Amino acid sequence: MKRLLTILVALLVFSGTAFAQEEGDFYDDGYIYEQNGAGDQYFKADLFANFPLSFGDRLFVGGGFTIGYYRFLNSLIAVGGEISPTYNVSIGVKSLIMVPITLGAVIVPTIDKFEFPMGISLGITTSTFDNNQSYFPSFTAKAYVGGFYRLNESWSVGLSGYFLWTPQFFADAPEKNYHGLFATAGLSMRYHF
């Protein structure tokens, strides 16, 4: 009898575990994950074609690259700077080399894993034409737009384009003043940390 009573009590105690359901450790605190946040940073690298817009047929399509660093102030706005050496060749096979160094701000709206940065930056450019005429510094303004796909937490790749305005002003010969206008289109990648 004692043995039967012990078996019945054991079955009664442990029978509840046969019907128990496991509920995971799910906890919803209402937090929505944001791709970028205040303090996030990224390095960027662009490789692009450089299209001269204000030189007629005297300057051919060239190329260049950009290396930049940006830091987010909040989930939408980042500030930083970049350097963008460019190269074009003229009809007389003379080279125009420009090195703009700019500081600016970028607005980065996101949709799921896609980011669409738009920004403006100001700075200076050193220019050399045919290795014998150097102009330094020149004012530079740059507008930027791009589209990126976030591969993972650290890397994103995409397409980007710039509009670059680099005027040349001469105090002693104002008739030589010139507004250099360039557009770029290229491939980009960013490392986020």
Segments and roles (model prediction):
Residues N36-D40, G56-G62, G92-M98, S134-T140, ...:
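Transmembrane beta-barrel outer-membrane domains
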Residues T166:
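Acyl-donor (CoA/ACP) binding surface of acyl/acetyltransferases
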Residues L4-F14:
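Sec-dependent N-terminal signal peptides
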Residues A20-L73, A78, S188-F193:
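Short glycine/proline- and aromatic-enriched beta-strand/turn motifs that initiate or cap beta-hairpins
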Residues S160-Y162:
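Internal, hydrophobic beta-strand segments that form the core of beta-sheet-rich folds
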Residues F51, G63-K142, Y149-V157, S188-F193:
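Gram-negative (and chloroplast) outer-membrane scaffold detector with strong preference
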Residues M1-L4, Q21:
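Positively charged n-region of N-terminal signal peptides that target proteins for export
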